[in-house]
């Protein structure tokens, strides 16, 4: 996770948690002159639109005061959804056994994209089984990771 994302996570997580939600993760996507700050919230009973609105109001207030992002951006608050992104080793461990899609920042063992069964974590590595081969992917090399929902 980049230092900018770590800074945003550290700023926003206490606000989200004070409202009774888990701050699942934060993404900042630069899109030219206009960017998107996406905050994922979760709780055991699920997330409703009213929850997103309440968190958005509080987070927006903190962002206005602290002003950690230069330039224009849109704030989006949502649940992680069925294809939830994974950000932390704890999240990867919690979802062991599920299908995942992982994209690395740069190639590792000759490839950048991995899709397979999440086996868990070992120290600072995410373990994924792809075509009967187990890969240990350093958490710091992961650009994006998502659960692949099953519909069976």
Curated annotation (Swiss-Prot):
CDD domains, alphabetized: YlxS_C (cd01734)
| GO CC entries | cytosol
What superkingdom does the record give?
Answer: Bacteria
Predominant localisation class: cytoplasm
Cell location: Cytoplasm
- InterPro entries, A to Z: Ribosome_maturation_RimP (IPR003728), RimP_C (IPR028998), RimP_C_sf (IPR036847), RimP_N (IPR028989), RimP_N_sf (IPR035956)
* Protein keywords: Cytoplasm, Ribosome biogenesis
Task: Report the record's Gene Ontology biological process terms.
Answer: ribosomal small subunit assembly; translation
**One Pfam family, short name:** RimP_N
The UniProt entry's sequence similarity note says: Belongs to the RimP family.
Give the function comment from the record. Required for maturation of 30S ribosomal subunits.
Which NCBIfam families does the UniProt entry name for this protein? Answer: PRK00092.1-1 (NF000927)
Q: Which PANTHER family match?
A: RIBOSOME MATURATION FACTOR RIMP (PTHR33867:SF1)
Annotated protein name in UniProt:
Ribosome maturation factor RimP
Q: Native species of this protein? A: Pseudomonas aeruginosa (strain ATCC 15692 / DSM 22644 / CIP 104116 / JCM 14847 / LMG 12228 / 1C / PRS 101 / PAO1)
- Show the taxonomic lineage: Bacteria, Pseudomonadati, Pseudomonadota, Gammaproteobacteria, Pseudomonadales
């Amino acid at each position: 996770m980049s230092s900018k994302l770590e800074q945003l996570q550290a700023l926003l997580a206490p606000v989200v948690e004070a409202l009774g939600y888990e701050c699942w993760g934060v993404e900042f996507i630069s899109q030219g002159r206009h960017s998107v700050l996406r905050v994922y919230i979760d709780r055991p009973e699920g997330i409703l639109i009213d929850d997103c609105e309440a968190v958005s109001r509080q987070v927006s207030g903190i962002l206005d005061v602290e002003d950690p992002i230069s330039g224009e951006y849109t704030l989006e608050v949502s649940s992680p959804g069925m294809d939830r992104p994974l950000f932390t080793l704890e999240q990867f461990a919690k979802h062991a056994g599920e299908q995942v899609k992982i994209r690395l920042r740069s190639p590792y063992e000759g490839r950048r994209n991995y899709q397979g069964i999440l086996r868990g974590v070992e120290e600072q590595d995410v373990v994924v089984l792809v075509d009967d081969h187990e890969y240990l992917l350093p958490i710091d090399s992961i650009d994006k990771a998502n659960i692949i929902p099953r519909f069976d």
